[in-house]
Amino acid sequence: MAKRNVLVTGGMGGLGESICTKMADQGYTVVTTYSPGNKTAKEWLAGMKSRGYSFQAYPADVTDFDSCAACVRRIDAEVGPVDVLVNNAGITRDMTFKKMTKADWDAVIRTNLDSVFNMTKQVLDGMVERNWGRVINVSSVNGQKGAFGQTNYSAAKAGMHGFTKALSYEVAKKGVTVNTISPGYIGTKMVTAIPQDILDSKILPQIPLGRLGKPEEVAGLIIYLASDEAAFVTGANISINGGQHMS
């Protein structure tokens, strides 16, 4: 594999960190973003370095187009062009629609969906010019089936795949693929913090495989989609949920 640069938004989270480390293990030069004002970024980078990973991280407000543009300009100048973009940044503001405020709606839509436009817009022209590129959008099983208390999150995650399908038509003949992955319950710190009795009684019974997914399993799917071997896969939404939702 030629040395390629991958940009992972939200790379310091539980799933994002696994994506970063596993892609580095495959020989990619990995760059990630962090929210301006994030006081843990230096600590995270130091921790990664102690494990043998020399990542570079750049501040970017993924909800702000100009901030994303400035971030990618720096990456282009200091690292090189982005060959693979993993749109992984996301938040939740879970509550019933009755209780949801406009601010709760906007925060999730801007972070989870607007960010996909904001970041992809900065890198796509370069991918097309080089006749090679990968855009991988990390959605969710709840974008496929919906979830109680997640009208904002489910709408944003479903919207990501609409973006994937439409854009894949535009760049298919330019060597650029655009795909969505939709993870189910993955064993990140956020999920494993759920009380065990809730996991055992409410969540695991929904999953035919009877367990949580592993972050490295999701990372493995992304590595495949980023590879030359996946050149014939575009416009797809690939489920990785242990059979929780089949479509």
Specify the residue positions occupied by each region the protein language model found:
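Conserved glycine-rich cofactor-binding loop
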Residues: 12-13
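Conserved glycine-rich Rossmann-like NAD(P)H-binding loop of the short-chain dehydrogenase/reductase
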Residues: 26-43
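Active-site helix of classical SDR
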Residues: 120, 156, 164
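Residue(s) in the substrate-gating loop at a strand-loop-helix junction
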Residues: 140
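Short, small/polar-rich loop/turn modules that mediate ligand/substrate recognition or access, typified
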Residues: 172, 177, 233-235, 241
